[in-house]
Swiss-Prot record:
This is Aspartate--tRNA(Asp/Asn) ligase. Coiled coil: none annotated. Aspartyl-tRNA synthetase with relaxed tRNA specificity since it is able to aspartylate not only its cognate tRNA(Asp) but also tRNA(Asn). Reaction proceeds in two steps: L-aspartate is first activated by ATP to form Asp-AMP and then transferred to the acceptor end of tRNA(Asp/Asn). Homodimer. One of its GO terms (molecular function) is transferase activity. One of its GO terms (cellular component) is cytoplasm. L-aspartate binds at E183, R229, H456, R497. One of its GO terms (biological process) is aspartyl-tRNA aminoacylation.
């Protein structure tokens, strides 16, 4: 087919924007062929552009040459069409299509490009392997649902910028090539040609630079920034990801959280047209772990964890009694109306909690005949009634117990809570439940490393009332830290920062760094603290995760234009890839690659 020149052509309208009000106008449209139907005397083409679809009718009576050319048009050809907008005949209106009240009768047709047959249909809900979608990402992104995701991403970023600009924040870029501080996740390293044997790293976050900007008197900073972590991937992780990074000087925690609530409400209104009520509830970390078994609680449903440690401490059931005696705890969930669960279903749940360290899952079924359970014989009537009262048990309920150290109980029942909610269809996908989780521990002890690790990062300030515990019992110190959670997913996290050199040096010492190590890694920050550092704090929001929740997707790969696979590769451009020996030589790098295991020989018959 002859390809027409684009010279002089100008689009007048987007096809998906045409309505009955445009009837009688002559328009020039441009887009892709979604579908072509030949009805003998007429040819119908659904023309697609970013705005949607419009039906173009080719009739030899209106445009003979255009009709002839349309006979050779196929799916995904790129067309320009000039034609007349006409109301559709009665009975042919398509109420499911925004432009469904009109057709465009083509006078002229230009074929701007042809196309091979795509490896999958360019339409929503297409059932195709994700690796194929990622390899042909330029086709996948033509699908309306994928374009909607990126449009919402754009609107979200714009809403963020508009809100922060109105509130006195400056958008300031920080370096992409920076210094290695190997305390957190594994870093991507960039060799320096000019400084042989030395490396930059790609930043995991702009944390230190934004604090330096506060020292520099910028007062209110933000940027929408790309960050990098060389870690194993999950559905909500990528080696490169985007976050909204914010820092403020002279702010109290309440002021910062209130401003962020206003920003989130603004984002959801501008990008989705949804009204979000504020303020968000605030839940202390200990309460979140105690009631929901998670520091990212999904508040769209109940199924709260009930502490029975005191209630069962004297029962004859050795599993419970020994755990309580050893300083552990016993907690349970009342799964309302689930007494009918089969033994297999309970066994499946038992296997589920075992992944989180639970050694078993005790249960009581509240049947018509009364409580039924392998453990009931170890309880006196008084003890059993006390447990049932504590759990609010009624006929038809299923009571599920885990006894272990607190971390295992929380993780196991936290999983069980989510799994039961999923099985019982308790999760309202339309509901938005925001919460701030606050008062995190500042550090946690690692018995293997025999040292403390920062829960958030080493620059998080301890609560003023806990400062005296820093020297004696750092594990009991609470942090001025906060995470914003939406429907069980962490949207963002931050803290008020340490802004005094003496406290920052003490924090490094608690984390096991010598004074020399601390200065080698963070000397520039410590030196900056000598020159009048203001009190400051900030937060970072994961933009990819936020868009994933806003669009109802299951993976952030659906809201990133060109994501990596779960094996950290780019299927479309085939990256990462080998480089030439010359490139390696320029960087003074020699490869020491792992030896590939030999392929097993087929067994001899």
């Amino acid at each position: 087919m002859m390809i027409d020149m684009f010279t002089g052509l100008k689009r007048s309208h987007r096809g998906g924007d045409l309505r009955i009000d445009h009837a009688g106008q002559t328009v020039t449209l441009m887009g892709w062929v979604q579908r072509r139907r030949d009805h003998g005397g007429l040819i119908f083409v659904d023309l697609r552009d970013r705005s949607g679809l419009v039906q173009v009718v080719f009739s030899p009576e209106v445009g003979k040459e255009a009709f002839t050319k349309a006979e050779d048009v196929r799916n995904e050809y790129v067309l320009a069409v000039t034609g007349d907008v006409r109301p559709r005949p009665e009975g042919t209106v398509n109420a499911n299509l925004p432009s469904g009240q009109i057709d465009v009768y083509a006078r002229q047709l230009w074929v701007l490009n042809s196309a091979k047959t795509p490896p999958f249909y360019i339409e929503d809900g297409v059932d195709v392997d994700e690796t194929v979608r990622l390899k042909y990402r330029y086709l996948d992104l033509r699908r309306p649902e994928m374009q909607r995701n990126l449009i919402i991403r754009h609107k979200t970023a714009k809403a963020m910028r508009d809100f922060l600009d109105r509130n006195g924040f400056l958008e300031i870029e920080t370096p992409m090539l920076t210094k290695s501080t190997p305390e957190g996740a594994r870093e991507f390293m960039v060799p320096s040609r000019i400084h042989p044997g030395e490396f930059f790293v790609l930043p995991q976050s702009p944390q230190l630079y934004k604090q330096i900007l506060m020292v520099a008197g910028m007062e209110r900073y933000f940027q929408i920034v790309r960050c990098f972590r060389d870690e194993d991937l999950r559905a909500d992780r990528q080696p490169e990801f985007t976050q909204l990074d914010i820092e403020m000087s002279f702010t109290q925690m309440d002021d910062l959280l209130t401003l962020m609530e206003e920003m989130v409400a603004h984002i959801f209104k501008e990008a989705l047209g949804k009204e979000i009520s504020t303020p968000f509830r605030r839940i202390p970390y200990a309460e979140a772990m105690g009631r929901f078994g998670s520091d990212k609680p999904d508040l769209r449903f109940g199924l709260e964890l009930i502490d029975l440690t005191e209630t069962v401490k004297d029962v004859e059931f050795k599993v419970f009694a020994s755990v309580v005696k050893g300083g552990g705890e016993v907690k349970a969930i009342n799964a309302k109306g689930c007494a009918h669960f089969s033994r297999k279903e309970i066994d499946d749940l038992t296997k589920g909690v075992a992944v989180y360290g639970a050694k078993g899952l005790a249960y009581i079924q509240m049947t018509e005949e009364g409580p039924k359970s392998p453990i009931a014989k170890f309880f006196t009537d008084e003890q059993l009634n006390a447990v049932l009262d504590r759990l609010g048990a009624e006929k038809g309920d299923l009571l599920l117990f885990v006894a272990d150290k607190p971390s295992v109980v929380a993780a196991s029942l936290g999983f069980l809570r989510q799994e039961l909610a999923r099985r019982l269809n308790l999760i309202d996908s339309e509901k938005l439940e925001f919460a701030w989780v606050v008062d995190f521990p500042l550090v946690e002890y690692d018995p293997e490393e025999k040292r403390y690790n920062a829960i958030h990062h080493p620059f998080t300030a301890p609560k003023d009332e806990d400062l005296d515990l820093l020297d004696k019992e750092p594990g009991k110190v609470r942090a001025k830290a906060y995470d914003l959670v939406l429907n069980g997913v962490e949207l963002g996290g931050g803290s008020l920062r340490i802004y005094r050199r003496d406290i920052q040096e003490k924090m490094f010492a608690i984390l096991g760094l010598t004074a020399e190590e601390a200065y080698q890694k963070f000397g520039f920050l410590l030196d900056a603290f000598d020159y009048g550092t203001p009190p400051h704090g900030g937060i970072a929001f994961g933009l990819d995760r936020m868009i994933m929740l806003m669009t109802g997707r299951d993976t952030i790969r659906d809201v990133i234009a060109f994501p990596k696979t779960q094996s950290a590769s780019d299927m479309m451009v085939d990256a990462p890839s080998a480089v030439t020996p010359r490139q390696l030589k320029e960087l003074h790098i020699k490869l020491d690659l792992p030896v590939k295991a030999p392929k097993a020989e087929p067994a001899k018959k």
